[in-house]
């Protein structure tokens, strides 16, 4: 098994639902051909270096996966046949990888990401709570100031 990276550019005018269906189709081809998806990174809309099909922008996507040459051939055949794909490019990252090691690496990265997301959510919750307490304290101070009469100078 080899490790590949494919970057493809889709039509930026596609609706999210159509784009997600397209992504699911490519992921399905990858699974059907026995590939292992390591990373699917949606880069979003970006300006193209030059117009493609009279479009100055494109929606970029990067897929990193393990598979065989037949998988790459099948993916690229589907890219060529689909009018929604403006450009694509596949490069070979590693010639020989262990599929089990790749699966373990993917699982470890997913676990690390979920831990990081949980820590971030915890930190956000603590920050919101601290801001709420501070706002409550500020309101209490303003109420106390409003209730106390101002001291007048005595002559």
From Swiss-Prot:
Name of protein: Small ribosomal subunit protein bS6
GO-annotated biological processes: translation
Region described as Disordered: 115-155
Protein task: Binds together with bS18 to 16S ribosomal RNA.
Matches recorded under Pfam families: Ribosomal_S6
Classification via SUPFAM superfamilies: Ribosomal protein S6
InterPro entries: Ribosomal_bS6, Ribosomal_bS6_sf, Ribosomal_S6_plastid/chlpt, Transl_elong_EF1B/ribsomal_bS6
The organism's taxonomic lineage, starting at the top: Bacteria, Pseudomonadati, Thermodesulfobacteriota, Desulfobacteria, Desulfobacterales
């Amino acid at each position: 098994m080899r490790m590949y990276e494919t970057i493809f550019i889709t039509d930026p005018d596609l609706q999210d639902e159509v784009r997600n269906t397209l992504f699911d189709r490519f992921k399905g081809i990858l699974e059907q051909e026995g590939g292992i998806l390591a990373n699917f990174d949606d880069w979003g809309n970006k300006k193209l270096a030059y117009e493609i099909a009279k479009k100055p922008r494109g929606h970029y996507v990067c897929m990193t996966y393990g598979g065989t040459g037949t998988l790459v051939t099948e993916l690229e055949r589907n890219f060529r046949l689909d009018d929604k794909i403006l450009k694509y490019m596949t490069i070979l990252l590693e010639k020989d990888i262990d599929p089990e090691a790749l699966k373990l690496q993917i699982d470890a990265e997913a676990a690390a990401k979920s831990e990081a997301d949980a820590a971030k959510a915890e930190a956000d919750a603590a920050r919101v709570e601290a801001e709420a307490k501070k706002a409550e304290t500020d309101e209490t101070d303003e109420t106390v100031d409003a209730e106390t009469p101002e001291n007048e100078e005595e002559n």
